[in-house]
Design a protein with these regions (language model features):
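Glycine-rich, low-complexity intrinsically disordered segments
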Residues: 1-168
């Protein structure tokens, strides 16, 4: 949550003759009231990677930032904002290696896709809110392994949902 607010707070900054002033929406103060405040340094979360089997995520779709979604203690921690862009992502494993390709949406990974090198994969992990690449790799390798055991398909296909101008 703090990693998302690190990005969103710039949307609420206003430059005045006295300096920068922030006009935060109520969700920001509710986070503070609930004790959600991180004092450790971190990299801001610039996007999220999601399955999208129903093709829900498109440019302009409104993002709802919730904790404990669809539960009694559900909590909106940031205001709704539109999706800026979406990219397809395809991950597969080769032993303990995670191979990652990215393409334009609806291109069905092919002509315009490109594979991320190790440095780009590290950036992807940080930008997706993981503390380091190993956490990211292990998270997605577990998902791929579980899917493989269920279906025989050892891969992950989803979307990178951007709320900033960043693209790969």
């Amino acid at each position: 949550m703090e990693k998302i607010w690190a990005v969103l707070q710039t949307r609420f900054a206003e430059i005045t003759p006295e300096g920068k002033k922030y006009l935060f929406p109520p969700e920001y103060f509710q986070c503070l009231d609930k004790g959600f405040q991180n004092t450790k340094p971190f990299h801001p979360k610039l996007h999220t990677i999601r399955l999208d089997e129903k093709d829900r995520w498109k440019t302009g779709t409104m993002i709802d930032f919730f904790i404990n979604c669809r539960q009694k203690d559900m909590f909106r921690f940031a205001p709704r904002i539109p999706v800026v862009s979406v990219q397809e992502i395809f991950m597969t494993r080769r032993g303990s290696i995670l191979e990652i390709s990215i393409a334009k949406v609806d291109s069905y990974i092919g002509d315009d896709d490109f594979q991320l090198d190790a440095f780009q994969q590290g950036d992807l992990a940080l930008n997706d809110g993981f503390d380091d690449y190993n956490d990211f790799r292990n998270y997605f390798l577990d998902i791929i392994e579980k899917k493989g055991k269920e279906t025989g398909n050892y891969w992950f296909k989803g979307k990178i949902i951007h709320w900033t101008a960043l693209r790969y």
